[in-house]
């Protein structure tokens, strides 16, 4: 009897001891981090999120729950331990030994343009016998992902894009200085054969052309107007506008041009309209793509005329101006018509999702290129 009582007392002391030990030490030297595989991806592109748990102590963790939430537009393929409502909620269970590091990779698809962050993780641990639970909150640093708008690719728009590209290249050709050499680049179908660099072509085995500097450095400007005065918001057209702007940006930058970008949609971080002055190369490409991803379209948009009318009219360093707007209300149309009278190098892309094209006044038909979304490309 005394021996049995001793066993019971020992078991009780063991239980209480481990419980006190876990309560005090379970989170010590325990690090949890989340990391996206990529800094930025395109809409519809696959990527992964890694959960990294490291237990740098002798005390094992029999059960550790890692809980976090993020935007529901990141479509995770592994649905076990998750639920999706207004947001995506994840609850993963780990068993971590002493001095052990565990990494779990979660595949997902970037379902929609945006800037996504995970700021904190909730941890729930248990004691050795799973009879008690302990909670803590961990701040996650530098866990963010850009999902860039995919370039608009409707066949009708591609035709308009080629036509615009020809117009801009013809205008740029007039600004080239034939006596100032800038470098060599890959041959493109629109290049003149007289610009071919045959020595570089023979050396590399790929067609190369000479690049010239310009008598004056002028830029292409892209303005995006997301202001919507209608009762029903055209969400599909708003997103299509940003995709059209992306296609324009990539096309001009690939030609080695300087590109400026302006949008009255507020940045989700600083709540200011997007203003990126003229620049070129990969740095400008990355900056504009990130700005496009961060544009918040959920609220009321600032007036385009109030924000950008002065910027629009100052066009002394502008080679061409592109406007993207799904709406053609009177004040905005009048502003562009006034500009077009002085500066004819202007193209307005107007996306629409209706079956029939919107009615345009005669004075606007020369200015506007209609971009249909149609059923196969209507909504995101």
Predicted region positions:
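Feature marks short, highly hydrophobic, charge-poor N-terminal signal-anchor/signal peptide-like helices
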Residues: 1-10
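Exposed, interaction-prone extracellular/peripheral surfaces
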Residues: 189, 193-380
